[in-house]
């Protein structure tokens, strides 16, 4: 049976049976996978401190049915700073849940792996966790093929730079200029500067997008508007959002 060694990010874990643990993974070579760590709850040596969510590890596994069987796991980066602040941890958990819910299993996307890894690193270093989350979601939308061009009005074709105010229906991928009133219940009202910033999330290299900064007044609207889009796409609530809302209320 073929054995594979690869870098991976632990997305989530849960107990399975009396001694095992199920592990959600995003791997560099195999994309999103579901693994089982046999005896992980009993052995203090084999997987000690290596299966914590939002950790970067090096895995050795073999495929067996619908699960991969974890043979060994070496901790590369625990991203400890995520665990020192509830808001950081809540956003990291939310990002992991988005990947679990929206990325199909067994579809390798090395660029998505790098995006996830770098996002966790930025969450540790950047004081503006919400800005990091927005940059991740927009880049994620682009890599998954959901982010529209945002170059002109989707109704009349008016160019983006010809107006300062726009309306973006995220669930439909429709950008509308002021000449075309659209249903605003599920739409984001954005200015030209914000739209140009979103477009830069697509065009800049990964190491440069973290310099982009959304205005304070638009970040919250964008964040919850995008989460509405995620919930509409997966057709259920995001469990980790409750943790994040709890963190903001404390």
Swiss-Prot record:
Q: Which gene codes for it?
A: recO
Which InterPro entries did the record assign? ARFGAP/RecO, DNA_rep/recomb_RecO_N, NA-bd_OB-fold, RecO, RecO_C
The protein, known as: DNA repair protein RecO
Family per record: Belongs to the RecO family.
Alphabetical keyword list? DNA damage, DNA recombination, DNA repair
Q: Does the keyword Manganese apply?
A: no
Please name every pair of cysteines joined by a disulfide bond in this record.
none
So what does this one do? Involved in DNA repair and RecF pathway recombination.
Q: Name one Pfam family in it.
A: RecO_C
* Listed GO biological process terms: DNA recombination; double-strand break repair
What is the scientific name of the source organism?
Syntrophobacter fumaroxidans (strain DSM 10017 / MPOB)
- For the keyword DNA repair, the answer is yes
> Gene Ontology terms, cellular component aspect?
bacterial nucleoid
